[in-house]
Amino acid sequence: INDDPVAVNDTDAVNEDATITKTGSEDDVLNDDTDADDSSSLTVTQIKKDGGSNSAVSSGSTYNSSGTSVTGTYGTLTIGADGSYTYVADQSAADDLDAGDTETDVFVYTVSDGTTTQTANLTITVTGVNDTPTAVDDTDAVNEDATITKTGSQDDVLNDDTDADDSASLNVSAIQPSGGSSSTVSSGTTYSNGTSVTGTYGTLTIGADGSYTY
């Protein structure tokens, strides 16, 4: 009689801005799946995101040749009938992850021996990495005989700067006049005890919190 295949759950991991590819019997989803009759006859016939609808996987396909793609929460999985797969993490979907934080994408694949089938999960752990902050140019104005001071998130230089991980963690670390040398801005400072640099028409004092006076 035909014995049912035994499908074993698989796991993998990737950073939020990376791609993983697994091929061959040592790495793909069929590596640890077995069939008492003939394990070499096993193929992947269907794939879906956990909770979603099944998509057929074409016979004879590989991850990079006629493979079937399924979009998860944090990336896209493409899998072949031979069990090979690639997972491309979606940077925009995972941007909210702080460095070191993890989330999972779970996919359910169907294994067939040609007669009967079993299902197993492929769980991809997506790990957040530190994202580069986005700094936006700022402008201000002052009369030639006056002083301006800007403090708080509505006025200082960090107001419109962002970080996908945590904008609240942003701080000013250095300041320099155009064409001049860079000066370090000490951690925890404000404009009142910050770093001063002299420009062509005045002196700017800025703190790590983004507040400044000119």
Go through each PLM region and give its residues.
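Acidic/polar, solvent-exposed loop/turn segments
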Residues: 1-213
